[in-house]
C-alpha cells in the first residue's frame, strides 16, 4: 500500500489559507525539494510526516489530504 498526497486538494487548501507550498514545507521541517517530490507523487509521506501534515492542516480529514493505492 502506498499513500500519496492529494496534490490538487492540498493546493486548493493552501490557496484558501493564502499560504504557499514553501510555507508548508517549512512548517513540516522538510526541504522544498522534498515537498515538490511529495506533491508530484514521486515520493510518499511516511506515517510520521502524514501526522505532521494533518497537524498543520487540522481542518481537513485524512481522505481530503491523502490517497491510498494498493500495490500490485
Predicted stretch roles:
Residues 14, 39, 49:
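DNA major-groove recognition helix of helix-turn-helix
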Residues 30-44:
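Recognition helix of helix-turn-helix/homeodomain-like DNA-binding domains
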Residues 32, 47, 63-72:
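Short, charged recognition helix plus adjacent turn
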Residues 1-20:
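A short, Lys/Arg-rich alpha-helix, primarily the initiator
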Residues 24-25:
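Short alpha-helical "recognition helix" segments of helix-turn-helix
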Residues 42-55:
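Short, basic-rich loop-to-helix N-cap that marks the start of a DNA-contacting helix
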Residues 21, 32, 50:
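Helix-turn-helix DNA-binding elements, focusing on the entry/boundary residues of the two helices
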Amino acid at each position: 500500500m502506498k499513500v500519496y498526497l492529494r496534490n490538487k486538494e492540498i493546493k486548493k487548501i493552501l490557496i484558501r489559507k493564502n499560504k504557499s507550498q514553501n510555507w508548508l514545507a517549512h512548517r513540516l521541517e522538510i526541504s522544498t525539494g522534498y515537498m515538490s517530490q511529495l506533491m508530484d507523487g514521486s515520493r510518499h509521506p511516511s506515517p510520521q510526516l502524514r501526522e505532521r501534515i494533518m497537524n498543520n492542516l487540522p481542518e481537513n480529514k485524512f481522505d481530503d489530504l491523502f490517497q491510498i493505492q494498493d500495490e500490485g
